[in-house]
């Protein structure tokens, strides 16, 4: 069984038309006989809007509740992707981090993934389903939703690749590959040809 993780960033799912294109990309890998696991960010702008709302309603909004609030962004994009895939004739459903579960430790708004339980997702893809997983979040020992550190959705995808023994992990973003720094900010950024899961996790945690 060939497993591929496809991670889509906020720009990639930033509009309904872009989500339709994302679904075509997913199907292209299904046709190549891959079992596809999708990890999605929130639509671009949604997370910032939710943060703005939390700041407007309270000057001291608890991080635990902010995590619950911010987790909604990824749920929206995942539901839209899964809904479109079903319309196109494919079995798909959105998976919240707590349903899998994706286990985290650390402080609210800055947690790290420590384990992803395999059973439900592996059984689902074996049955022909396309899971669409919320990135950037997990649940802690108290069964509370937590959000990850900067670069959290990339980290979610990389950890999925590790725990699901994926053959490939492809991250769709607004730059062409992995760079030493943001090429949109510095012309001196260099493209990295090859990188390990551990190195990717370290880079993702640093944003």
Predicted region positions:
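Nucleotide/pyrophosphate-binding catalytic subdomain
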Residues: 1-207
């Amino acid at each position: 069984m060939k497993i591929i993780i496809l991670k889509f960033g906020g720009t990639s799912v930033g509009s309904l038309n872009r989500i339709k294109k994302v679904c075509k990309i997913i199907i292209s890998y299904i046709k190549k006989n891959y079992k596809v696991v999708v990890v999605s960010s929130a639509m671009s702008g949604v997370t910032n809007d939710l943060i703005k709302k939390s700041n407007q309603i309270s000057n001291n909004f608890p991080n635990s509740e902010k995590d619950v609030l911010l987790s909604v962004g990824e749920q929206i994009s995942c539901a839209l992707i899964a809904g479109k895939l079903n319309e196109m004739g494919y079995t798909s459903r959105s998976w919240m981090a707590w349903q899998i579960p994706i286990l985290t430790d650390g402080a609210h708004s800055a947690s790290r993934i420590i384990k992803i339980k395999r059973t439900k997702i592996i059984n689902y893809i074996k049955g022909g389903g396309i899971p669409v997983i919320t990135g950037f979040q997990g649940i802690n020992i108290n069964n509370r939703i937590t959000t990850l550190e900067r670069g959290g959705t990339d980290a979610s995808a990389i950890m999925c690749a590790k725990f699901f023994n994926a053959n490939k992990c492809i991250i769709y973003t607004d730059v062409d590959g992995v760079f030493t720094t943001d090429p949109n900010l510095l012309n001196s950024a260099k493209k990295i040809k090859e990188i390990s899961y551990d190195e990717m996790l370290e880079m993702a945690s640093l944003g």
